[in-house]
Design a protein with these regions (language model features):
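N-terminal signal peptide c-region/cleavage motif recognized by signal peptidases
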Residues: 6-8
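Charge-biased low-complexity segments
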Residues: 12-202
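Sec-dependent signal peptide recognition
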Residues: 1-3
Length: 202
């Protein structure tokens, strides 16, 4: 599930994903207040039901628009990571550090609250409206690097469903907290982390 990799300076900021989430959550909050005012002011139950239906439809559209923005952030992030890899190639440095099985890891990289908290947060961040599948149970293995400062980079989901893979990558890049980095000989090191995901789509 895990393997150690030596330290290199490729770091990915997930700040853009957080900014997008915060932006759309702020707009959801403002819209909810406005719809609530309109709903509370209406006395006719038929119109109240219509306002509620409009609100639900509007929020579904907001989710879809947010997903488009997150997909754009994912493409930008992957392009920037590819450019970083090209810079390493130009400097004749290896893209992937050599795996050293004999190195003893003092402490593995860990997410605050542990693996179950990470799985829960990733599941909560999934946008199911962006997944297209005839199969109800979808699986993917998500690999990424935990950098020495706890940020994540090079997220890559591998599975049979492209849309599920893309949503998995967006969800992992969007997690709210940094990891505690792996430690070798008292020093933080880059660490390859694997997260198997299974989701039932209804």
């Amino acid at each position: 599930m895990f393997c150690f990799i030596s330290s290199l300076c490729l770091s990915q900021q997930t700040e853009e994903f957080k900014l997008i989430k915060n932006y759309y959550n702020q707009h959801r909050s403002m819209l909810s207040k406005e719809f609530r005012k309109k709903f509370d002011a209406e006395t006719n139950n038929y119109y109240k039901a219509s306002i509620k239906q409009d609100y639900q439809l509007f929020m579904q559209k907001m989710d879809s628009i947010e997903n488009v923005a997150l997909t754009g952030a994912l493409l930008k992030t992957k392009n920037l990571e590819d450019l970083d890899k090209l810079k390493l190639l130009n400097k004749n440095l290896p893209l992937e550090p050599s795996h050293t099985p004999s190195v003893v890891i003092d402490k593995a990289a860990d997410y605050p609250g542990g693996i179950n908290e990470l799985r829960k947060e990733v599941a909560d961040l999934f946008y199911l409206g962006g997944i297209y599948s005839d199969i109800k149970t979808i699986k993917a293995n998500v690999g990424f690097i935990v950098e020495t400062d706890g940020r994540i980079s090079n997220v890559k989901a591998e599975g049979d469903n492209y849309t599920f893979n893309r949503q998995a990558e967006i969800a992992v890049y969007s997690v709210s907290q940094k990891f505690s980095p792996a430690i070798v000989n008292g020093n933080p090191v880059r660490y390859r982390f694997r997260l198997p995901l299974t989701m039932n789509i209804e």
